[in-house]
């Protein structure tokens, strides 16, 4: 089941909690993507240097597999890594579209 979330609320909570909500959001989205067929490893890798880069790649790979089939996982990984502030907007927008379709 995909949860529709407000982008404004996502960013406001992320700012107010000094980024902690973004980590919570990543955990929730990872669970949703995995339930839809992605294979994203445990979020504990987020707190381990270097392993967090691997985790982000696997997240991008899962995002592409579930929501953007046929597109490049490497492109999304680089986008998420280099311009990380827009990553939640991209991912949540796609999840919201899926939720509206009933996915």
UniProtKB/Swiss-Prot annotation:
Signal sequence annotation: none
InterPro entries associated with the record: DUF4234
Gene Ontology cellular-component terms listed: plasma membrane
Transmembrane regions listed in the UniProt entry: 10-28, 35-57, 72-91
Keyword set, alphabetical order: Cell membrane, Membrane, Transmembrane, Transmembrane helix
The keyword rRNA processing is assigned to this record: no
Name this protein carries in UniProt: Uncharacterized protein AF_1598
Subcellular compartments: Cell membrane
Top-rank taxon: Archaea
Membrane topology value: Multi-pass membrane protein
A Pfam match: DUF4234
């Amino acid at each position: 089941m995909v949860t529709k979330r407000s982008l404004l609320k996502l960013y406001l909570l992320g700012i107010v909690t000094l980024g902690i909500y973004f980590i919570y959001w990543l955990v929730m989205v990872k669970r949703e993507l995995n339930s839809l067929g992605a294979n994203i490893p445990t979020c504990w890798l987020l707190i381990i240097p270097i392993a967090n880069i691997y985790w982000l790649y696997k997240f991008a790979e899962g995002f592409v597999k579930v929501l953007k089939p046929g597109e490049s996982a490497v492109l999304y990984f680089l986008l998420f890594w280099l311009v990380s502030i827009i990553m939640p907007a991209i991912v949540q927008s796609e999840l919201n579209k899926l939720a509206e379709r009933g996915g």
